[in-house]
């Protein structure tokens, strides 16, 4: 068999696998949005059966045979060619999948499905003790998986693993390591705490009461749809639905869905939650369709994905220019804003206040929420913390970093869906996304000129096109670190983000 024939076999086989994965994504969307209460048990078994089938395909020995034919051939001489990018990723996925026993793959799928279902039921009841057995099972399985992946090792192009946590982190942010994250987070938290002290000491406080007036759910949805369309989200290739925990999910080309949640007494959750998920969806809609079903057509990492969502939620969506364009329309849609001035509204949606809930945190304190989760996850995987002690450790870290502490579990250790789905190692990608976003945005302004005047005129296409060319079109051709450096000229770091916050919040809070 020639290398060309082997590569064609790989393309066809992996695309077929991607179609099956796409069905899994559709089932996952349904589970989080529309499924009847009594359907969860059957759905968990469906997901386990699909996981078994996907694992069988991922470990098919023909993959190894085809890869051997292609590796070392002229097809992959250029390490940045489409074929080389695909083959390298397929080899890594094949070795990782072969190392995971089918029994573990199926158990993980079922435990994740059951864990999310339990979390949805038990969190509103504040039932930590009821949730703990699910979390223990998920953690044990994740640790078993990490031990196996640790033995397999990383991609040869990436740094070696230093500890168990790295093996899971690497699945979300290729090349990221705990030993690099810890000093980066220390630098960031030092800058954030200094900025937070100046904000709280400024004496200025926005009237956030305007955000807690009455905002009917249907009006929020209608307004959110207008924003989506104006910013460039293709509503003929997606949809917006309500859910308990907002998410974006790509079913496939032409089907990238957004969910959000609305509170009639809080403006931010529904509107900025929608803009956040829209950022994710714009990335998915901008990936090269010709490469769908291959690594070349996938996002570079969750951190890069998060850079797109945080950009549209915050750097665009919370800018004064954005609301110069949309606040007059918001006043038409929401009568409760009739007496509110643009400047006061803009200050309110950028209010800084230490709080308990990560997804509702402001730009200044958000990454301190992530620091808490990173330190707790590291302690768990290093054997320095037991799950039974997690709630108290959570409270202690919130007191230390944010000066607040939860009185219950639902707004404390149970607030996020991630651990209920076994997603250990995911949280750091949120902060990395914020850092990447600031660097990308600064570079875009350097090349396109000031962006806020464009936003004020409702012109979002120049910026969206820039991100499509520089980031989306590249798929996973580059590792996250290399992509950031290629686009911005600098490696990922904290300083661009801290400069952005300093300029914005210095102006708002008068220092």
From Swiss-Prot:
Binds 1 zinc ion per subunit. Can also utilize cobalt ions, but contains bound zinc when purified after heterologous expression in E.coli. Residues 3-506 form the Peptidase M32 domain. GO terms for molecular function: metallocarboxypeptidase activity; zinc ion binding. GO terms for biological process: proteolysis. A motif (DXRXT) lies at residues 255-259. A motif (HES/GQ) lies at residues 305-308. Optimum pH is 8.0. A motif (HEXXH) lies at residues 276-280. The active site is at 277 (proton donor/acceptor). Keywords: Carboxypeptidase, Cobalt, Hydrolase, Metal-binding, Metalloprotease, Protease, Zinc, Zymogen. Optimum temperature is 80 degrees Celsius. Its EC number is 3.4.17.19. It is an enzyme of class 3 (hydrolase). A motif (HPF) lies at residues 245-247. Its cofactor is Zn(2+); Co(2+). Pfam families: Peptidase_M32. Broad specificity carboxypetidase that releases amino acids sequentially from the C-terminus, including neutral, aromatic, polar and basic residues, but not Pro. Belongs to the peptidase M32 family. This is Thermostable carboxypeptidase 1.
